[in-house]
């Protein structure tokens, strides 16, 4: 058993395997969020991008891949492919080779190309700006939609992955059994 000092002065007793969870009351949650926001005032996506389309592609590539690896891949990828049309002009094999290092490359290429076609056909060549519309694109789930919506369009959204889920529930910011419920509680 060990002690974990919470930033606002209290101690939390942690079991050896960190299975203990702590429920914060509303005031404690607000204090914790204030500390996080003051500590990380300029928090943003770690994926390199210069426009919403690049962020969408980078976020699709980030599944089961580190942001560092994605940023290495997208440096050349974004120089080669400027917009949705560019991904549709070349052979699938060429794009697969371009993103091979990020894993799951075949399904990612399929999703990217289908998303590009939908962006052209359904959204006048522009990345959709709502979470609901983003989630109609192949390979875009709640987390990806939230990342794009919040970072590209300034829409308040929290991207809850397994890490955010685990830590939020462990330190008491949420008390939920699913990623979806954790997201609702963090909003």
Placement of each model-derived feature along the sequence:
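Catalytic cores of DNA base-excision repair glycosylases
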Residues: 15-187
């Amino acid at each position: 058993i060990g002690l974990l000092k919470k930033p606002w002065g209290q101690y939390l007793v942690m079991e050896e395997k960190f299975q203990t969870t702590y429920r914060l009351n509303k005031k404690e949650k607000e204090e914790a969020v204030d500390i996080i926001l003051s500590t990380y005032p300029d928090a943003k996506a770690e994926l390199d991008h210069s426009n919403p389309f690049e962020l969408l592609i980078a976020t699709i590539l980030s599944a089961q891949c580190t942001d560092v690896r994605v940023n290495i891949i997208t440096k050349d990828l974004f120089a080669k492919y400027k917009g949705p049309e560019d991904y549709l002009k070349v052979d699938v094999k060429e794009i697969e080779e371009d993103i091979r290092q990020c894993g799951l490359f075949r399904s990612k290429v399929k999703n990217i190309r289908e998303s590009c076609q939908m962006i052209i056909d359904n959204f006048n060549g522009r990345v959709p700006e709502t979470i609901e519309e983003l989630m109609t694109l192949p390979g875009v789930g709640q987390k990806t939609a939230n990342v794009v919506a919040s970072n590209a369009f300034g829409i308040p959204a929290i991207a809850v992955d397994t890490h955010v889920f685990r830590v939020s529930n462990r330190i008491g910011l949420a008390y939920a059994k699913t990623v979806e419920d954790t997201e609702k509680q963090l909003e």
